From Swiss-Prot:
Its EC number is 2.4.99.28. It comes from Escherichia coli O1:K1 / APEC. SUPFAM superfamilies: Lysozyme-like. Pathway: Cell wall biogenesis; peptidoglycan biosynthesis. Peptidoglycan polymerase that catalyzes glycan chain elongation from lipid-linked precursors. The keyword Hydrolase does not apply. This is Biosynthetic peptidoglycan transglycosylase. GO terms for biological process: cell wall organization; peptidoglycan biosynthetic process; regulation of cell shape. Keywords: Cell inner membrane, Cell membrane, Cell shape, Cell wall biogenesis/degradation, Glycosyltransferase, Membrane, Peptidoglycan synthesis, Transferase, Transmembrane, Transmembrane helix. PANTHER family: BIOSYNTHETIC PEPTIDOGLYCAN TRANSGLYCOSYLASE, MONOFUNCTIONAL BIOSYNTHETIC PEPTIDOGLYCAN TRANSGLYCOSYLASE.
Amino acid sequence: MSKSRLTVFSFVRRFLLRLMVVLAIFWGGGIALFSVAPVPFSAVMVERQVSAWLHGNFRYVAHSDWVSMDQISPWMGLAVIAAEDQKFPEHWGFDVASIEQALAHNERNENRIRGASTISQQTAKNLFLWDGRSWVRKGLEAGLTLGIETVWSKKRILTVYLNIAEFGDGVFGVEAAAQRYFHKPASKLTRSEAALLAAVLPNPLRFKVSAPSGYVRSRQAWILRQMYQLGGEPFMQQHQLD
């Protein structure tokens, strides 16, 4: 290998190492800060806003209103757990059984990829990372998930998740969603409304709360049944999530 190539390789290696250190400090600081402070915006919100500007859409505003857990209907927390991660109170960030099932499904159905991200993983991804699929991003997501599971309580993870989740075009967080779609604060959401909001979470830019498709309605009904089977509101109290 020539001296010039060695120099370039050495420069790139030093740059990447320094970048990793900077990102580790940034993300570690974010995990520590947001364990107590409200989250003003997420990486997904920034990505959506910048993308809108780059496409000439200057009317787009990524909107979110932070609310604490006692300002959110307990039905909402229960709905997203029923829909997205029923083992949320028990695991340490990863649902191994669901991951194995998703891998088996994806091997059989290459055109219909199924995910197995927990609420903790989705929180880490939405808060700190860019959109897309790659092994690098998955590795970073795993590390960040372990970080927030170590530092944050389950209640804090759920609170942050509900405040940064995307519920529609420019609608981030359950308070903004409740105001936009039901003209009420998040604290007043009914069981049915909470289930409808949770029903669009797989793809909130495709599935609409304001114009729910047959699929969304059937998913809403399924979520309502799961909420009942989990035990209703006492489930949240039992796991200290309310």
